[in-house]
Amino acid sequence: MMHLYHSSSDRINKLITRAYSTSFSLGILGLNRSLRDPIYGIYGFVRVADEIVDTFHGFDKDTLLKRFWKDTHLALDEGVSTNPVLHSFQRVVNTYQIDRSLIDTFLASMEMDLDDRTYSQAEYEKYILGSAEVVGLMCLKVFVGGNQAKYEELTPFAMKLGSAFQKINFLRDVSADFNTLGRTYFPNVDLTAFDDDAKRAIEEDIAVDFRMGYEGILRLPKGARFGVYIAYMYYYALFQKIMRTPST
């Protein structure tokens, strides 16, 4: 009956994805059916870690994140977990040989969110790498299906697309992050005096990432291309809306 636990775990990650992310949900529906459950598995894992640091207020977030991190490695080592999210995720990681360094880099970026901070350039780049770029690489491992040469070819493009998506999230949520969570992700930006010039500089940086990300989409295997393009168009439309919105 293990297959029933496998499928139930996959469905839980699918429910999490649909509850939390319109863009990911739409994009996944555009993927080849064989790719959908693995990507749901990655998103479910990423979402739970993000929720620990962003919404588990009133609880010991540091302890919870460390426990989740430890449980992740136990699941990967043992090939099973009583946590359905981690069980589904470990199957994806072990099936597609996703490098564990990507997972640790992601979780390290979540750990950065435990402290209210204004990010330096180096911290900003480290956070983008961990919170977005390596997630793109996890997905890319699934998309290329074991073709290491294709993975290496598309790595810089996948990283730039993940970077663009995350920076758009930052720009969309800039006020809430600053006023509610005490975070300032963009380096060298004074959010108490945020103006159109500062906003435009960020947008120009995002546009560069977007262009390179699109080039990578065109090179993806056919089964993944349309789904990633849907997510790209969702974020591109959001980006256009943000660019039309004044800084204040």
Go through the PLM ranges and name each one.
Residues 1-165, 171-248:
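Catalytic cores of Mg2+-dependent Asp-rich isoprenoid enzymes
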